Amino acid sequence: MKIPFEEISRIVIEGNYASIFLISGKRYVLKTSLKRLQMKLNQELFIQSHRSTIVNLKLIGRIDLNRNKVIMKCGAELELGNKFRNSVKAAYH
């Protein structure tokens, strides 16, 4: 399956499966790892925001550092891991 990078909003890993959420609202589930996906993604467009989440930088609405959340333009609120706070904040601004 080929999905254009710019159509991916976020990727959430649950166990051995990755849920790929598209801007259109569609969701695809693949059996793969976070590391495998990171190798295929455009590193300038995507950043890891949590141990199980990768987000599209262009689709971040805002970052709430008080609540450790990444709020996507679509309204989805995702956890922001302490380990990833600084890198997400720097890449977003």
Can you annotate each of these PLM segments?
Residues 1-93:
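Basic, polyanion-interacting recognition surfaces, primarily
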